[in-house]
Amino acid sequence: MFVKTGDKVRVIAGKDKGKEGTITKTVAGKDRVVVEGVNIVKKHQKPSNEYPQGGVIDIEAPIHVSNVQLLDPSTNEPTKVAFKIEDGKKVRVSKKSGNVLG
């Protein structure tokens, strides 16, 4: 997967198209990511220790990784990601600016 937890991304497709946020969780087996403040859905929660009241709560649901594009940290513009081998390690590189991504 070309994105990691903590990356800033922009949603490029779907109901939240154009929104930006930080990736809070990745679901690798299904190629999905949870982006902060994006794809908010209502969930009917049974009472539990965490939610003693229960009821309807808003949560961030995962979206497919193909619907997000990484933002280049130096220019804050959407960019594609390339992979290079540097000093024997595989690193992510921004195709737009050529900078190594954290």
Swiss-Prot record:
SUPFAM superfamilies registered for this protein in UniProt: Translation proteins SH3-like domain (SSF50104)
Keyword Cytoplasm appears in the UniProt entry: no
One Pfam family recorded for the sequence: ribosomal_L24
Origin: domain of life: Bacteria
UniProt GO molecular function: rRNA binding; structural constituent of ribosome
GO CC annotation terms, alphabetical: ribonucleoprotein complex; ribosome
Gene3D superfamilies: 2.30.30.30
Classification via InterPro entries: KOW, Rib_uL2_dom2, Ribosomal_uL24, Ribosomal_uL24_CS, Ribosomal_uL24_KOW, Translation_prot_SH3-like_sf
GO terms of biological process kind: translation
Keywords: Ribonucleoprotein, Ribosomal protein, RNA-binding, rRNA-binding
Keyword Ribonucleoprotein tagged: yes
Ranges annotated as spanning the membrane: none
PANTHER family xref list: MITOCHONDRIAL RIBOSOMAL PROTEIN L24 (PTHR12903)
Subunit structure: Part of the 50S ribosomal subunit.
HAMAP family (alphabetical): Ribosomal_uL24_B (MF_01326_B)
Family: Belongs to the universal ribosomal protein uL24 family.
Function text: One of two assembly initiator proteins, it binds directly to the 5'-end of the 23S rRNA, where it nucleates assembly of the 50S subunit. One of the proteins that surrounds the polypeptide exit tunnel on the outside of the subunit.
The protein's name in its UniProt record: Large ribosomal subunit protein uL24
Biological source species: Leuconostoc citreum (strain KM20)
Highest classification ranks of the organism: Bacteria, Bacillati, Bacillota, Bacilli, Lactobacillales
